[in-house]
A protein has these predicted regions:
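Residue(s) in the substrate-gating loop at a strand-loop-helix junction
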Residues: 9
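Non-catalytic terminal and boundary segments that flank Rossmann-like NAD(P)-dependent oxidoreductase
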Residues: 87, 135-161
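SDR active-site lid
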Residues: 42-112
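Active-site-adjacent segment of SDR/Rossmann-fold oxidoreductases
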Residues: 14, 35-46
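Active-site loop immediately N-terminal to the catalytic Tyr-X3-Lys motif
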Residues: 14-20
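Short-chain dehydrogenase/reductase
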Residues: 114-125
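Active-site helix of classical SDR
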Residues: 25-28
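Rossmann-fold scaffold of SDR-type NAD(P)-dependent oxidoreductases
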Residues: 6
Length: 161
């Protein structure tokens, strides 16, 4: 018996531009965790996913584009920085909140399978599920930043710019 806690991300439920490898790993971790939960349940082992939104850490400073990609992806990189900076300042999750969630899971007799932390993550997943990937793909065609952030504000209900 026991509890396995995997730290995933909202990126395991929806994609984020310029984060393809990260999203792929988190999607895989979610699938692995849900499969494992089924397989080990008969042994009294619980598998739980903690899925924070933006976490206030320096990880995002490491996402510089290689020179050969700047011409094609600089706009997306700029949007990513603006959105994450806004998220970090206003809605970001403190790492201590993740630790507290893990503590709650360990002492709980019946933890949920998924703990989607912070309102930004819940909003992102809700909107992505409601609007579908097609809307997100269409948003990728918007080249004007002001228009892009206007659409995002209408979709999510808060200013991401």
């Amino acid at each position: 018996s026991g509890t396995i806690i995997n730290i995933s991300s909202q990126a395991g439920r929806r994609p984020f531009f310029l984060q393809g490898p990260y999203c792929a790993i988190k999607y895989a971790l979610n699938g692995l965790s849900e499969t494992l939960a089924h397989e080990v349940a008969k042994f009294g082992i619980r598998v739980v996913l903690v899925e924070p939104g933006v976490v206030r850490t320096p990880i995002f400073g490491k996402n510089a584009l290689p020179d050969e990609d700047k011409e094609h992806y600089e706009m997306l990189q700029s949007r990513t920085v603006r959105m994450i900076t806004k998220g970090l300042m206003e809605t970001g999750c403190d790492p201590i909140d993740i630790a507290k969630c893990m503590e709650e899971i360990v002492v709980s007799e019946n933890p949920k399978m998924h703990y989607l932390l912070e309102q930004d993550a819940r909003d992102n997943i809700r909107v992505y599920d409601e609007d579908g990937p097609e809307a997100w793909i269409e948003d990728g065609k918007i080249e004007d930043d002001d228009e892009y952030f206007k659409v995002q504000k209408e979709r999510y209900g808060y200013d991401l710019s």
